[in-house]
């Protein structure tokens, strides 16, 4: 069927050799994808951190409030959030009409991914040994200091793979903006295919671009994770203090008594030589 429609012909790929195809369709769409993904990921990290910390707060009302927000926006599909935001922004003139689709895409991606990141953060902190928090409190640190200085850095390092996976999801979900007229790489690829009648080639190029983006993001995350682990390993190195001749018998590892020593006296049974 594809060969009958000419989709497998070599001339269907020639438009991608022409720079006009890239400057008119692909590159503007790629910029739209990257722009919406970067903005939404940054806002989702801020939102997720705030909701995640509120989720483990000692204030009960704050915990309930954050839990309601998290569970609500995690349950709503991203596309519905985008359509809702688009209609709301247009109805009340919240954003300029030229930025309407972009704002709706960022809103949908931020609310959904921020809620997921908040739950990832909460579970990451909850998985840490309780002894660390107890030790910090015993040292006189407040609950806030314990969370920011002890628990949060470890939780972020532990949940980094899950965070990167969520960022990849945000990057791919930006393609849903096609439904509300947002110019991103999938929409641009389809527009290019409509002009050149090469749907298979255009979709293949778009898929290849998304694969390269996701692979690059995953590789960057893996490198950051290795650096974090190496940094923690360097911090955990304990230098061994060399023993001094007059150190004395301070630990059981340093005690080496010769039971055949004639000068040894058993303190439990006085008089025994």
From Swiss-Prot:
**What is the deletion mutant like?**
Deletion of the gluABCD cluster almost abolishes glutamate uptake activity.
Q: How does it sit in the membrane?
A: Multi-pass membrane protein
- Disordered: where is this region? 242-273
What is one GO biological process annotated to this record?
amino acid transport
Record's subcellular location: Cell membrane
- InterPro entries the UniProt entry points to: AA_ABC_transptr_permease_3TM (IPR010065), ArtM/GltK/GlnP/TcyL/YhdX-like (IPR043429), MetI-like (IPR000515), MetI-like_sf (IPR035906)
Gene3D superfamilies, per this entry?
A: MetI-like
Membrane-crossing residue ranges in chain numbering: 26-46, 64-84, 100-120, 150-170, 200-220
Keywords attached to this Swiss-Prot or TrEMBL record, sorted alphabetically, are:
Amino-acid transport, Cell membrane, Membrane, Transmembrane, Transmembrane helix, Transport
Residue ranges annotated for the ABC transmembrane type-1 domain, each copy included? 30-221
User: Which PROSITE patterns does UniProt cross-reference here?
Assistant: ABC_TM1
MF (Gene Ontology): transmembrane transporter activity
This entry carries the following GO cellular component terms, namely:
ATP-binding cassette (ABC) transporter complex
Task: Please verify whether the record's keywords include Ribosomal protein.
Answer: no
Compositional bias (Basic and acidic residues): 262-273
Q: What does this protein do?
A: Part of the ABC transporter complex GluABCD involved in glutamate uptake. Probably responsible for the translocation of the substrate across the membrane.
Q: Which family does it belong to?
A: Belongs to the binding-protein-dependent transport system permease family. HisMQ subfamily.
Assembly and partners are described as:
The complex is composed of two ATP-binding proteins (GluA), two transmembrane proteins (GluC and GluD) and a solute-binding protein (GluB).
Protein name (Swiss-Prot/TrEMBL): Glutamate transport system permease protein GluD
Provide the taxonomic classification.
Bacteria, Bacillati, Actinomycetota, Actinomycetes, Mycobacteriales
**The gene coding this protein:** gluD
């Amino acid at each position: 069927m594809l060969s009958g429609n000419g989709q497998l012909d070599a001339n269907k790929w020639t438009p991608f050799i022409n720079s006009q195809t890239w400057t008119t369709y692909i590159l503007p769409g790629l910029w739209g994808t990257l722009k919406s993904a970067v903005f939404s990921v940054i806002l989702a990290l801020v939102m997720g951190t705030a909701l995640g910390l509120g989720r483990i707060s000692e204030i009960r009302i704050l915990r309930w409030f954050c839990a309601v927000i998290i569970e609500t926006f995690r349950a709503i599909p991203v596309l519905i959030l985008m359509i809702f935001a688009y209609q709301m922004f247009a109805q009340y003139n919240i954003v300029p009409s030229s930025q309407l689709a972009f704002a709706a895409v960022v809103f949908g991606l931020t609310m959904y991914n921020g809620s997921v990141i908040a739950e990832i953060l909460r579970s990451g902190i909850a998985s840490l040994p309780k002894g660390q928090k107890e030790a910090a409190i015993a040292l006189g640190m407040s609950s806030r200091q314990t969370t920011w200085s002890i628990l949060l850095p470890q939780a972020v390092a532990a949940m980094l793979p899950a965070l990167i996976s969520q960022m990849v999801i945000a990057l791919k979900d930006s393609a849903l903006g096609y439904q509300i007229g947002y110019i991103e790489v999938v929409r641009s690829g389809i527009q290019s295919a409509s002009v050149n009648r090469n749907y298979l080639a255009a979709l293949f190029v778009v898929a290849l671009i998304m694969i390269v983006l996701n692979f690059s993001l995953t590789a960057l995350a893996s490198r950051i994770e290795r650096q974090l682990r190496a940094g923690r390993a360097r911090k955990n190195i304990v230098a061994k203090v060399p023993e001094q001749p007059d150190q004395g018998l301070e630990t059981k590892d340093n005690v080496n008594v010769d039971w055949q020593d004639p000068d040894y006296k058993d303190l439990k049974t006085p008089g025994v030589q």
